Amino acid sequence: MFNQTQFFVLLAVFTTSSVLGNNNDVKDGAASGAHSDRLGLWFGPRLGKRSLRISTEDNRQAFFKLLEAADALKYYYDQLPYEMQADEPETRVTKKVIFTPKLGRSLAYDDKSFENVEFTPRLGRRLSDDMPATPADQEMYRQDPEQIDSRTKYFSPRLGRTMNFSPRLGRELSYDMMPNKIRVVRSANKTRST
């Protein structure tokens, strides 16, 4: 595995240097100003500097060289023994999830019958049977007559506003006069309402 990675790194460095090496030719051995002591290094283009010549032919040649290098990499990778090649990621699910219930809980929870247990609110005192410990549900959850009204209140009573909402000022609608069922009729001549 280590030899394989060394091979690919060496091949990638060789192809990159051969592609980029063609663009950094120093002509006639002349130094280029401030970069005269850095002949062998290339630091990339300066930001904001635009090239005077637009050469699509050079870019096309560089692209073809990169494609050729990638093709060579694939060829030599296919020549490697099968054990040294990378395995494809598995697409199948091989791990099964096994459900384990929590301790103390059985799957047949509904089949259990619970016994009535007497509740003593304080130690040493028991309530008599004729006096319930808590108020009945009807007493506890009985709604006020104001809440039974089917229409919702538009103002919160805690703000001190208890007036009924009317759609227009000075006009009270009587909802008793409105029909329970509304008849919807379609036009016979296929006109559309806007």
Swiss-Prot record:
The modification Leucine amide is found at residues 47, 103, 123, 159, 169. Residues 1-23 form the signal peptide. The keyword Secreted applies. Synthesized in the subesophageal ganglion and released in the hemolymph. GO terms for biological process: neuropeptide signaling pathway; pheromone biosynthetic process; response to pheromone. One of its GO terms (molecular function) is neuropeptide hormone activity. Keywords: Amidation, Cleavage on pair of basic residues, Hormone, Neuropeptide, Pheromone response, Secreted, Signal. One of its GO terms (cellular component) is extracellular region. It is found in: Secreted. Belongs to the pyrokinin family. A hormone that controls sex pheromone production in females and pheromone responsiveness in male. Also mediates visceral muscle contractile activity (myotropic activity). Juvenile hormone seems to allow PBAN release, which then induces pheromone biosynthesis. This is PBAN-type neuropeptides. It comes from Helicoverpa assulta (Oriental tobacco budworm). The lineage of its organism: Eukaryota, Metazoa, Ecdysozoa, Arthropoda, Hexapoda.
